[in-house]
Each structure stands twice: as structure tokens, then as C-alpha cells.
Regions:
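Accessory nucleic-acid engagement/destabilization modules that flank
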Residues: 1-250
Length: 250
């Protein structure tokens, strides 16, 4: 975990946002972290005290832990972009690390919000979330991710959402590992270590709303266009062929 948190510790070549006009590429991991951070601001500045308490009570955790969990869940919304989505645009796809581009055999096209829902389910279970039934907290968190474009999706626990089917559809071992590492890094950086034993429907709806707002705010074109062209890792020579950062030249 500490290694992944270092500048050169994790592959940041997969893209999250792309401006065709400016050819500006914004790394997916940065977008996930942006949305998590903005979700914390939405919690502090937009939600009422009653809404914050409703979410905390709906998860059975204190307010401070609830804030961390809301940030974590909001940040996970685009985890499903670590999949065939990456090939949608040729320019940013060409920047994806060689190792990842070589590990795509068998992956299938899937809306990224559904891919987020499906891929997160197993990761949530591995993290200790109950995913046994449709009303379990792990399943509801996964559905929050699937609904970040405004429509709640059905999650078929015994069908399309089974880990064996998901792993076949969303890329090879390197993509699976990177999804796991992004998940773990987000959880670590947001402090969302507590595992809620429940997640009520009203809390789920409010958390979905926080995530939608945070995503919209963090995805404003004028911000992404500027930031997508400026980080050190996107300067000439700042990314190695493995997609990991190295100091900029010059």
C-alpha cells in the first residue's frame, strides 16, 4: 500500500477523461481521487446535518466514519473504466502502458457504470463487506457505483455479477490487479477502513446523490483541460513504458 502511494508506485496510464479538442488526457486514478475529495466537500458544505446523520445511521457508523465511507464510495464510481472502455479513444489508449495493452484478450464491451458495479462487488466482498443478498451493504454499494449516471441498475448476483464472469469480461490479470490496487489505494487515502454492517435504502439514495454531484463538479471541462495538460507525469518523458511515473526531463 505504501509503495502504491508513492509517485512511481502504481500504473497511472489508464485515462479517465479526454478532451478531443485539446488532446488533453487526465489519468483515471486522479479523477477517482478528485471525486472522492469533492464528495467530502459536498458532505461538509451541501448536506444538511439531518442528511449526514441519516447516512451515518443508515450504515450504523459515527459521522466521521460515514464521511470517509461516502468519499470512498464516490471515488470508486469509475473503477469500471479499467476495462474495454480504455479502447474507446485511440489517442489516450496509445498512452496506456504496454503491459496493460497486451492483457486484453477476451474482454468485452460493457457500459463503464455497469463494469464499476460488477468489478467492485468482489473487491468489496474481499474487503469484508457482506454481499450475500440484494439488501446487503456490499451489494448496495456496488449499485451506488452503477447508478452514478442517474439510473439504478439491477445486479444479478448469480449471473453477470459472478466473479468468474466478471474477470473474463473485464480484461486479464493485470487489469484485475490494477482494479484491486486502485480500490485499496482509494480506501486507504479516504480512511474508509470501517466496514458497515448495513446500508439503508435512504442512505444509499443520498450517497448516490453525493457521488453524482461530486462527479459533475470534478468533471468540469475547463478544469480537466488545464490539469490534464499540466501534471508532471504527462510532460514529455514523464511516463515510462510501464505506465509508471518517473521524473520529468528538463
Amino acid at each position: 500500500m505504501l509503495e502504491d502511494a508513492r509517485f512511481s508506485g502504481i500504473d497511472v496510464s489508464p485515462w479517465g477523461k479526454f478532451d478531443r479538442g485539446l488532446l488533453a488526457v487526465y489519468p483515471l486514478l486522479f479523477h477517482l481521487l478528485d471525486v472522492a475529495a469533492v464528495a467530502g466537500e459536498v458532505w461538509d458544505r451541501v448536506l444538511t446535518a439531518g442528511q449526514r446523520q441519516l447516512i451515518a445511521d443508515g450504515m450504523g457508523v459515527p459521522l466521521g466514519e460515514a464521511r470517509c465511507l461516502v468519499m470512498f464510495v464516490a471515488g470508486l464510481h469509475d473503477l469500471g473504466k479499467l476495462a474495454q472502455f480504455q479502447q474507446r479513444e485511440s489517442h489516450p489508449w496509445a498512452r496506456v502502458s504496454l503491459a496493460l495493452r497486451a492483457d486484453t484478450a477476451g474482454w468485452q464491451r460493457m457500459p463503464h457504470e455497469r463494469a464499476s458495479m460488477h468489478s467492485a462487488l468482489q473487491l468489496l466482498e474481499d474487503a469484508g463487506y457482506n454481499t450475500d443478498a440484494s439488501d446487503s451493504p456490499g451489494v448496495r454499494v456496488a449499485q451506488i457505483l452503477g447508478s452514478h449516471h442517474g439510473r439504478f441498475l439491477q445486479l444479478d448476483l448469480d449471473g453477470a455479477a459472478k466473479a468468474s464472469r466478471v474477470n473474463l469480461a473485464l480484461g486479464g490479470p493485470k487489469w484485475q490487479d490494477l482494479r484491486r490496487r486502485y480500490f485499496a489505494l482509494l480506501r486507504h487515502l479516504t480512511g474508509a477502513q470501517p466496514v458497515p454492517l448495513r446500508l439503508s435504502v435512504p442512505a444509499s439514495v443520498l450517497m448516490t446523490g453525493v457521488g453524482v454531484i461530486a462527479d459533475r463538479l470534478a468533471s468540469q471541462r475547463h478544469l480537466l483541460a488545464a490539469e490534464g495538460s499540466s501534471p508532471r507525469i504527462w510532460r514529455s518523458g514523464a511516463l515510462g513504458p510501464d505506465g509508471q511515473g518517473r521524473p520529468a526531463v528538463g
